Amino acid sequence: MAIKKKKKETKSKDNNNDNLRNEKKSTNLENGKYDKKKVEIYEHGIGGITQNKNDNNKENAYDDDIYHDKSEHINVKYLNEKDYEIEKVSKRIYEENSKIKKISLHHKILKEELETKQLIEQNDKKKKNSLDYYKKVIIKLKNNINNMEEYTNNITNDINVLKAHIDDERNERIIYNNNMKILINEYNSLKKNIQDLNMQEKEQHKFNTKLKEELKELYKEKENMEKKHREDFKKLQQKIKEQKILSYENKINDLTKEKDKNKMENGEANKYEDKHNNNNIHNNNNIHNDNNICNDNNICNDNTIHNDNNICNDNNICNDNNICNDNNICNDNNIRNNNIISSNNKIHEKDNMINILNYYEDEKKKQLQNKIVMLKKLCLRILFINEYQIYNIKKLQENINNMNNAINSINLISYKKGDFDHIIINLNVSKEKNYSLISRINLLNYETNVLKQLIKKMKEKFKHLNLQNDEIINLKYDISNNMNEKMKHIKTSLLTNQETCNLKKKCFDDCLLYLKQLYTFIKNYENNNDKLNIKSQIINKDKNLHFNYIHKYNEDILVDENYINDFLIYIEKYIYSLNFYLPTQNFNYKKYLLHNGSIHNITLDTHASSKEYLQKEDSSEFNQHGHNLLRDSLNLNEQQENKDHLQHEEHTHEEEPKDANGDMVNIEDANGDMVNIEDANGDMVNIKDANGDMVNIKDTRGDIENIEDKSGDMENMKEPNGDMENMKEPNDDIQILKEPNDDIQILKEPNDDIQILKEPNDDIQILKEPNDDIQILKEPNDDIQILKEPNDDIQILKDPNDDIQILKEPNDDISTINNLTTHLSNENNLMTDLPKVDHKIKDEIQSEHILESTNISDDNINKENSLEIPLNYDHTQENILKNKNNMEDQNNLLEQNIMTDQLQNHKECEEFKPHDNKEKNNIINDDTKNLISDDTKNIISDDTKNIISNDTKKILSDDTKNIISDDTKNIINDDTKNISNDDIKNISNDDIKNIGNDNNKPYNEDHNIVTINDEKANYILNHFNSRNIEYDKLKEEIPNELLNIKYDSSKKSTISTN
């Protein structure tokens, strides 16, 4: 502002100076400042310009006067111009001086401003070095980071929404394509039927044309017959006429002879009369007969004049007689001819009728023969349909096996971080095969409908037949009965076939179980998270969208068994809704619970407090994370059936070979394979058959016979009642924990405690069945022998055949992992068992009761079992979670898992020590240190090195490096850096060094790791809950076309995916 004011002042001064100079100029001109003398002096000073001009022009005085006047006038103007130019130059100089002054002023002002800025900067530097300034900057940065996070969250939510809609569109396209395939098949079948109908119409048309031609021929024959009749009638008439003429001639000849006799007597009399009579005779003969005329002429010529009168008289008489006779004869002949014609017509009509009847009978016979041939063809076709149906039943079995595979893929829902795309791939495969199944059933139904129509047509045709014929009636009844029997057989085979019904029930029950598990998980997850309500996040709440499929069924999912196709669509949409609304890939709730040490390390002092803890935590803390997965999923009837089945199988396995102490007996078969048969407490029987295949039979709680061939396929053996108990029966443990009365019984009865503690371990150690080292962890007697009898331990670990055979079966581990999903749903049960473990470690009295109930002599043995069995469980699950993303390469990590299990057992023993009393610490330290220092170090140092060096170095050379690198990346991304790094270091480093390092770690480091992971997991939960806040913003940004999509299972018939 100061600079602008100074500029204005300088401008005003310049204007004032210009005004003054113009005023001076005007005053000088008015006063006549430029005189002649001054002009002359000025001219001399310039150079005498005017004098030279005057000298040249002195001759004419008059002219001189005139010139002087002009020169004076011109010189004044010139001087004024020069003066004006001088003033202009002076103005310019003044203006330049003023500009220089302005520039100097600007320089001064800039110097002042620079000084002030330097002072301000110095003050700012002092302030920036202060803490308050840094705090403000940090707050601003945090706000910016939060804004960026909100922005990225909005973008990710938009992307997730769009992904879901893209997946839905993809599914709709798949459904559309599948429907188009079905429609094309139906269209082709309709085309074929139409072609068949056209062929039949053409045949009928040909047959009709033939009939028309035959009718035309018949009409022609009729006409020909009529013509023949007419011709015959004419011929008969002519013959009759000829006969009459002959008879007349004979009579005339007789009469002529008589006349000749009379003429001889009366020859000469009455000549005139004779002449006149002769003329009359000639006329009469001309009228009646031409032949008579000729004869009369001859007679007239022969007769004499004398006999003319007699002759004339005779002729008159004869003529009269002849006329009478002719009339009579003609009448008789007419009557006779009419009678003959009528009789002939009747005869011909009878012949025609006979011919027509014969023709129709021939046609009826031909039609009957054609019908019999058609019926024979139909019977053959029905037989073919029955054979085709047997083939279709085999196809049904294959398709339902594919359905079972799809159901097993549904088991992996909780296994791959919430991604469900791989399940939908398997579902789509099973659906396509199910479509082929349904199309075959539709073909059978179509054929049955065709048969029905044919039966109706046959009945209609039989109505027109002659019912008096017994053969036709018998044929009709036989054929109709056979057709009805075949129809009934087809219907019953389609609807009431036990094989297909059982297979359908398998698929249906399995799907129901898994969907119930999913439903209960989501329901608990929603109800126990107040901030996170998945129902409120459904886009376009009023219309049918994802979760309408879930919540409309509630706990009892009501789907008809016959509509498997719609049921598959329901499963697919259910999984997609889970994939969209469940936590993102960064948050894995199972890992969060497993690695959250604050939950695992809870200890309780008294028996009563443990009850209260179980009841509280069962309802509050564990429910917050959605781990009461299978609360009300089973009925009491199913539990009772399971218990009966368990008792039956426990009696069957009591007859298995045992030694005196009830330990496991190793039996070698003829091929040298090991047959490991465990006691009733171990609940595991591993048998190798002659082919080297593993047969895993689980007894008390599993009720599964997992028969694994070399290809790694699973066969779930079923009870005869048709219900799948594989997935239902492991849930008994959960319901035992659910009811408070059962909890009290569990805590009071030590025998039940052992079973409950052991069974979860058995469920998860199915994954590691091929490893003898993990089986050692399960079997109580063998655990003690390892820890106290070094010679036996060395013999067990030095059996190279078992380990080598285990490592050489690649598909066993993968196929056993498929069993994981049947048991991972029991996590809540296992989590609630962990505080019991702590309680059991503390109570020596209960451990003594346990020893008495199991009939084992050594007290220290069961102390080690009570420590090791539950502790090993948690880390086997951790190893399972580490190897999730590398399903195919798990065989390469078997040895690593064995070693990490052995190391982590010691680590967890130390984790539980700070919570125990001093006496118990002394007992555990005395027992475990001696055992570990004397026995297990020797075993690990000598035997496992040899096994790993000889057998598994080749396997673990290249693959494990890649696997470890992949595991580290994946686990670091999943917010479990500290735990994963420790585990990976344990895998990659030497095993003996790890024992020392893990035992020397203090408890505080592990506790710090746990708290850091708690904060990270809570941050991820809060991040997930923030989606509810941003939902309104998302709803405004998403286009309406995506929001208004409806999902109806009736319109759509199916899945796919990456």
UniProtKB/Swiss-Prot annotation:
Span of the secretion signal? Answer: none
Question: Where is the stretch described as Disordered?
Answer: 1-34, 641-665, 706-728
Q: Where is the composition biased (Basic and acidic residues)?
A: 11-34, 641-661
Query: What biotechnological purpose does this protein serve?
Result: Possible candidate for an effective malaria vaccine as determined by epitope response in sera.
Specify whether Repeat is a keyword of the entry: yes
Coiled-coil-forming residues are 515-544, 872-905
Q: Does the keyword Repeat apply?
A: yes
Sorted alphabetically, which keywords does the UniProt record give? Coiled coil, Merozoite, Repeat
Q: Which domain of life is it from?
A: Eukaryota
Write out the biased-composition intervals (Basic residues): 1-10
Q: Could you tell me what this protein is called?
A: Leucine-rich repeat and coiled-coil domain-containing protein PF3D7_0703800
Q: What phylogenetic lineage does the species belong to?
A: Eukaryota, Sar, Alveolata, Apicomplexa, Aconoidasida
